[in-house]
Amino acid sequence: MDSYDAVRDLHAWRTDWNIGVKVLRRWFIVHRNGNPGLAFVFVDEHGSRIYGTCGATCYEYFERVCLEGGWVRLTNFGLIRSDWERKERVTKHKSQITLNSETKASRIRPLSEDPFMNFVDFDDIYNRPYNLLYPVDLIGVLVNVGELLTSDSSSGSTEKTLKFTIKNLEDRTVNCLAHGDFAVDIKNQTVGVDGPVAICVLTDWMINKYQDEITIHDHENIGFSRFFVTPPIDEVLIYRRKIWEKIKKRMEDARNHGM
C-alpha cells in the first residue's frame, strides 16, 4: 500500500509532498483577475482538511481529474499561507494548496469510507463564539420550511431566500437561511418532508450572529454548503434510532401516567 504524507504536516518549506486525499468539496470560483478557477477542500484518511485552488491555465485538467467524492494522489503542488478572508477560510489549516501546471494528480482507491462530517452540538452554536469563524456541520429534524422569498442581494441584484428550522434530540432549534439557487433546491428537496424522523444534514454552513440572534447561513462561496434529506450514512441511522427510542419512552411514560 502506498504511503502518503499527512495533510496536517503540510507546510511551504518542503516541495516534495505526496498526499492521498479525497476531494471533499469542489466549486467554481472567479479569481481577483477575473479568470475562472476551481476551489477544493481536500481531506486525508485521518480527517485533516486543506483548501486548494487552481487557475484558468489548468482548469480543464483538474476539472477532469479531481472529481468531487473521488480520491486522488497529489504531488508537485504549491503551498501558501491561508487567506484569512472569510470567503477563503473554509478549513483550519494554516496553509492552502495551489494546483498548477507542474502538479500531478492521479486517481486512487478510497483510503477511507468515512463521510468526514463533524456534527456540532446545538449548544456549542450558542455558547462558543469561536464557531463563528469556520463552517460547521449539523444534523437535526426539519420542523419548519418557509416560503421562497425574493430579496435584494449585497451585489444590488435580487435573489431567492429560504428560511427553515431544524431541531435536535433535546428539541432545541436553530433557524437557517439559504440563498439563490441553493434556496430553491432546498425548497424542492423538502416538499412533503415532515414528521418526527424528517432528518436533514447540513454541511459547511456558517454561524451568523446579529445582536443576540443566531442563525445558520449557507456559505458565501456558492456551491460550498450542502443540504441533504436523510442521506444514507451511519450517523442518520443512529439519529433515527434515538428518535424512535425517545418516542417510545414518551409513549410508555404517558401510558404509565394514565394507569
List the predicted regions and their residue ranges.
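Single-stranded nucleic acid-binding proteins centered on OB/S1-type folds
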Residues: 1-259
